[in-house]
Amino acid sequence: MACCAPRCCSVRTGPATTICSSDKFCRCGVCLPSTCPHDISLLQPTCCDNSPVPCYVPDTYVPTCFLLNSSHPTPGLSGINLTTFIQPGCENVCEPRC
């Protein structure tokens, strides 16, 4: 994930799309995993921008990752509107290319 193209997001729309949310706002582009290794995973966004200032500072918050269209219940999420999209020119999943 560290070699993702700047400002490209690896989130794919569809039944396998994952959403990772937190109480922190990442000001630059992030790459999110397109699949979850477990039903519920604790993940944090990976910033893919080559920004001089880190857009994410580790904290004690607990991010949540869940698989859309899965039968597994999502913990503590209600009344949240989520929209996923693929940025122009970023149709392919980010792949390490070092």
Curated annotation (Swiss-Prot):
GO terms for molecular function: structural molecule activity. The keyword Acetylation applies. One of its GO terms (cellular component) is cytosol. Localized to the cortical keratogenous zone in wool follicle. InterPro entries: Keratin_matx (IPR007659). Residues 3-59 are annotated as: 3 X 5 AA repeats of C-C-X(3). The modification N-acetylalanine is found at residue 2. Keywords: Acetylation, Keratin, Repeat. It comes from the Eukaryota. Coiled coil: none annotated. The keyword Calcium does not apply. Sequence repeats lie at residues 3-7, 8-12, 47-51. PANTHER family: KERATIN ASSOCIATED PROTEIN 3-3-RELATED (PTHR23260), KERATIN-ASSOCIATED PROTEIN 3-1 (PTHR23260:SF3). Interacts with hair keratins. Belongs to the KRTAP type 3 family. In the hair cortex, hair keratin intermediate filaments are embedded in an interfilamentous matrix, consisting of hair keratin-associated proteins (KRTAP), which are essential for the formation of a rigid and resistant hair shaft through their extensive disulfide bond cross-linking with abundant cysteine residues of hair keratins. The matrix proteins include the high-sulfur and high-glycine-tyrosine keratins. This is Keratin-associated protein 3-2. It comes from Ovis aries (Sheep).
